[in-house]
C-alpha cells in the first residue's frame, strides 16, 4: 500500500480529545496519550496528559494517505506502557475513503466510540478527531519543534485494525481539570477491573520508545468556555474531585450540573431558581421530629381558612375533627401572665405566649386533656381518645406531674431522673406495635432535650442579617458572640424587613443559610460520589486561607439549629455523621465517598492478591499541583501489602480517604459544634438518628415514589409489589424516612421529587429487583437506589421482614 501513497502529506489529522476513558485502576487515574498509525508505516504520538479520564490534546499531524488507507488511533496509559497490555485504553479504526474525499477536499470532525482490542479488555469512552485536506495553515506542532516518538505498537497488544462505523456527529469535548479540584489518588498500582478477574501482570516488551510528557503550546480551553463555545457572562466551568463537570454562576453564586444554554436568559433562570427555592422552603418547613408530632404545633401564619373552634365532644367524629382543625375548648377568665389572644385574617383565634415567643391554637385556660392516638379497624391513625387529667387516677410511684410556664402538662420520673410529655397512666403509643427504633429515637430525643445543657438561657440573642449577604453577615454575627449568648432566645431580623421572630424568621434564616454555607461555590464542601445533593468536606478547602474559621462557624450553626430545635436543609454522607459521633469509619462508609475505591478494596479483601497487586502501605496525594507520598504507617512505602496484612491496609486506606484528609477541617467544625452541643449528649443517637435530628423528617409522597420506580424481575401488578406499597403507605413519616435511608443512603428527597433521584453515576430511579430467598431479609444498594426484595408469599411476612431490615441496619452501606 505504501507505493500508492503520495510523496507529500495530503491530510492533516488533529487529535482533539478523548472523553470518559475507562478507569482501569481505581487507585489512580491514567496518564493517557494517543498513537496514530497509517498502514503500519507512519506513526505519530501525542503528548501525555497526566491523571485524567478526559484528556485534551488538540495536536496536529500531517499524513500521507489514499482512500484505502486505514487510520488507527490507539490510546494508552503511559504509566503502564511497558506492561503486557501496554495500558491499553481503546482504539478507533477509520478508512479514509469512507469519511473524506481526498480529491474534492474537505474538513470532517469525527466522534467515534473507542473499541476493544483482541485481548477483550474493557474499554469505554469516545475519541474526537478532525481530518482536513487543508494544509495551508502552519502545523503548530512542527512550528514549535515538538519531537514525536515514533512508536510501533507491540504485537503483545493484539491490535488488529478494523474498519470503524460511519462518522458520528461531533460531541462536546472534555474540559481540562481545574487545579483547585485536583484528584488525589492512591499510590499508582495495577488493580483489576471488577468486570473480570485479574490476571498476573507479566512485563511486556514495549517496542520503540516510551512517550515522554512533552508539553508544547497546545490550545487549552479556558474555564470560561468548552467545546460548545463560550459560556454566558459570569459563568465558569469546573470539575469536582471525581472528574464531573459542573458550572458556577458567579452572578448568583450558585452551582449546577447543567450547562447554561446559548440562549441563556438571566430573568428566566432567576424565575426558575425562585420557584425551586419555594418548593424547597415548603418541604423544609414541613419537616419535624417524633416529639414534635405529639404536642401542639405552633401555627404558621397566615393560615388558610379554618373552621371556628368548637368544644370537644365525646363522639369520635368530633375527636377526629379536633385533630384536623386544632379546635379546643374555649377557656374562661383571665389569660395567664404574658399571654395574648389574637385573630387570624380568617377570624380564627390563636394565642401568643410572649414569655417563650411562641404561638399556639390551644387556649391556655382550657381544661387540660390528654390525647392518645390509636388505630381503627383499617389500621389508620385516626382515633383520638381524650380523658381529663382528673379522671385518670393517681400517678405511679416516683412520678410527678408539673406544668410548664405555658400551662402544658409534663411528667417527671424521679426513678430515672427523666421527663416526658407522655402520661404514664395511659397506654403508651410507644409501647405496643411500635418498632424498637422508634421507641428508642423518641425517648432519646426526650432525654436529649430535657438536659440542662440544652435549656434556653434567659435573655435574647439578636442576629441581624441581609438576605442577599446572609453567609457573610451570619459569620460576622455568630462568631462575634460567645457560646453562652447563642444559647439565649434567638431573635432573627432581616435587614429592611419588619417582623417579630416567633419561629418563622428563624426557620427561614436556617433554611437560607444552609443553602449558602454548604454551596460548593465556596469550596468548603463538595458533592459526594453517591449523588449530587449529599455533601462531604472538600479536602482542598485550604484554597480559602480562612477555611478553618469558616468550618468552626458552620459547626456553630449546626449546633445552634439543634439547640433551638430548627432544621438545616442539608444532608451529609453517612460517614460524616459517624465522625460527629466519634465512631470508627468502615469500608462500607467508603461507598458514599468513592464507589470505585470501595469496590476495589472489597475485591482486595475477598481475593488472593499475591503476585497480582503490587501495593505498599502508602498513598499518593496531590494538592494544588504538588504531589507527595504519604505513609499510612511509619515506613509504609517500603512495606508490601500481602494476604496477611491486607485487612490492615484496607482499614488504613479507608481512614485516610475519609478522615485523615479532612481532619483539620472536621476538628474545626466539631470545636464550633461542641460549644453548643456537648459531645456526651449527642452520642445517645446513632448516625441515622443524627441525620434526622439535623435535617428533620420529610413528608414523603408515596404516590410520587411509586410513579418513579422501576422493577426488575417483578411487574407492578405482582402481589409482592402491591404488598410492598401497601406496607409503605401504612408506615408513618419517620418509618418512610428510615426506609429511604436504607435504600438510598439519605432521607433527602430532590426538590422536584423522586423523578430527580440521583445515583453514583447520574440520574438513577428507585428500583425494586427480584432477588434473594423468601426466608432472607431485603438488601439495599444505596449507590444505585436499588432494593433487592425476595418474593415473600404474604403481606405479613413482607411487612415483618421489611421492618427488621430497616430497624436493625447499622451504618449506611448495605452491600
Swiss-Prot record:
Bias type Low complexity, positions: 165-185, 202-212, 324-333
WW domain residues: 229-262, 333-366, 393-426
Composition-biased stretches (Polar residues): 213-226, 253-270, 295-308
A Pfam short name: C2
GO cellular component, as recorded: cellular bud tip; cytosolic ribosome; endosome membrane; Golgi apparatus; nucleus; RSP5-BUL ubiquitin ligase complex; ubiquitin ligase complex
Region feature (Disordered): 134-237, 253-353
Domain C2 per the UniProt entry, residue ranges: 1-112
Location(s) in or outside the cell: Cytoplasm
Residues the record marks as active site: 783
Catalytic activity, as annotated: S-ubiquitinyl-[E2 ubiquitin-conjugating enzyme]-L-cysteine + [acceptor protein]-L-lysine = [E2 ubiquitin-conjugating enzyme]-L-cysteine + N(6)-ubiquitinyl-[acceptor protein]-L-lysine
Alphabetical GO biological process terms: cellular response to heat; cellular response to L-arginine; chromatin organization; free ubiquitin chain polymerization; mitochondria-associated ubiquitin-dependent protein catabolic process; mitochondrion organization; nonfunctional rRNA decay; poly(A)+ mRNA export from nucleus
UniProt-listed Enzyme Commission number(s): 2.3.2.26
SMART domains in the record: C2 (SM00239), HECTc (SM00119), WW (SM00456)
Example of a GO MF term: ubiquitin-ubiquitin ligase activity
Keyword Transferase: yes
Keyword terms: Cytoplasm, Repeat, Transferase, Ubl conjugation pathway
Pathway where this protein functions: Protein modification; protein ubiquitination
Biased composition range(s): Basic and acidic residues: 279-294
HECT domain span: 482-815
Enzyme class: transferase
Function: E3 ubiquitin-protein ligase which accepts ubiquitin from an E2 ubiquitin-conjugating enzyme in the form of a thioester and then directly transfers the ubiquitin to targeted substrates. Probably involved in the regulatory network controlling carbon source utilization.
Protein family (similarity comment): Belongs to the RSP5/NEDD4 family.
Quaternary structure and interacting proteins, as annotated: Interacts with creD.
Protein name, UniProt field: Probable E3 ubiquitin-protein ligase hulA
Organism: Aspergillus clavatus (strain ATCC 1007 / CBS 513.65 / DSM 816 / NCTC 3887 / NRRL 1 / QM 1276 / 107)
Lineage per the UniProt record: Eukaryota, Fungi, Dikarya, Ascomycota, Pezizomycotina
Gene: hulA
